[in-house]
Amino acid sequence: MAIDGRSSSKPFSRFYLNSFEEGRVTRLEKVSLVGHGPPHEKSYISDATKNKSVWLSEKEPSLPRYQRLVVLRSLFHALLLRPRRSFALLCYSCAAPTRTNSKMCGAQLQIEQTNASSGLVRVIGRWSLVALMVNTMIGASIFGLPAVIAAYLGKWSPTGYFVAFVGISVIAACMAEVASQFQEAGGPYLYARAAFGRLVAIQNGWLLWLARVAAVAGVANLFITYLGEFFPIVKTPLPRAGILAALIGFLAAVNYRGVAGGNRVSNFFTIAKVSLLSFFIVTGFFRLLLHSDLRVTPQSVNATASDWFGALLLMVYAYGGFESALIASGEARDTRQDIPVALFVAIGITTFLYVAVQILVIYTIQNAGTSETPVVDSARRFLAPLGVQIIAAGTLVSAYGYLSANMLHTPRILFAMSRLRDFPAIVGKVHPVFRTPHISILIFAAAVYLFAVAATFRWNAILSGVARLFVYGTVAAALPVLRKKQPTADAFRLPFGWLFCFLGLLFTGALVVRMHRGELIVIALTSAVATLNWLWVRRQQAPSEATN
């Protein structure tokens, strides 16, 4: 039996009722045994109202009562709304032979529709998106930044997080509307391409990818630093390089084999990290309430406007990462409904954790701004030695969880650029077995390893924070442009969108002008490389356009 010009030695019937309201019928692409072998194809019918899918096969076990009702209701709606199309579809499905059952290998089959255009598997749900964003935002920075913020703002440092929360929420609101208009992988790069064209998109893609590579490499450096507290030998050059290779290589291998595997690893580390932080917060506040002698007077600082801007820039770095989870939207189940909810839930959870940790640090440590390990030093004030060791180990879990989240979503930047012909085609290849952008994953892992081995945490952190501000500004500016280009788009609409756009640009612009010359030089060099990439793309496309 031939389907779409491709011969198949195993004939099967495949039909998919997709959106009965519009009467569109779309064939099922491939269903993947994620991480457990090649794609398998079967017939199923989808409920248009609940986006549920059930198998239809002569040799399958009988369907549960709920699924039988789903099938009957779907057929009833189809026959009422599009009787001629539905009749033709049912005739075709009855006439086509059904694929015989074959033994499935290993684990339970995950039934997910792939992205018809890219081949990526849509397995990331709403709460997995929340976990991914929280995991990305709460990296190792939460264990080091409280001291730096306290040095800038003193007793007003918890208030600083609320100010940063307002600014980041404005950016997130703009992203919620813009992101809900896209189903493909790519995140802010894709939004810039639709709004401003190829040149700005390539610039945005390079800056975003560079920001993530530098951030992940910096956290990998911190992981080695914290691990050195337990095993000092890892700080020497050769063991350090070996541990970094094992650290980055393992997560690359997990995500190479399947997005569901990477999704599970990311969720595991998010739960572990938030649980440890919750243990620290609950125990700390409980002890402070019962033992007032543990409390110290917060450090008093006469914060200037420059201090506030410096602290806010670091807080933007601390919140950074929520936008990167949108890069994996090509594998999200429902971008229009899930992304806006996931964004604000994740930012709310992150703000609560940051503020709570900051309060504990400044009220338990004298001169908190001078501490190198503020969370561990704070834990020593109210926890037994075993508890302090648990918190120290939590630092390693937090750092490694941050790496796992970024290894899942950041490779999709180059993947999206390649699929849109803004990068070499080989980067956009999807693995024939695991259905993952394996080339992009390998490139990202190699870049992270090189940055981690060759540079320091400070250099990587500065580079990441500066690049991220430009990405945020581009997304805010894209909101009114996309509204004008797609006035009837089926997307989340932000009330007072123009006001949010203005506030987002004002927030990012105010921080950009506070950057130092060295940071701007790095951004200028990155922009120059992106411009060369754009010129290469134009040169590659010129012959094909002339032929046409």
Task: Name what the model sees in each region.
Residues 122-133, 197-210, 244-247, 302-315, ...:
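Select transmembrane alpha-helical segments in multipass membrane proteins
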Residues 190-191, 197, 228-233, 342-406, ...:
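TM-loop-TM module centered on a large, flexible mid-protein loop between adjacent transmembrane helices
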Residues 238-290, 302-304, 343-347, 464-474, ...:
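Membrane-interface loop-to-helix entry segments
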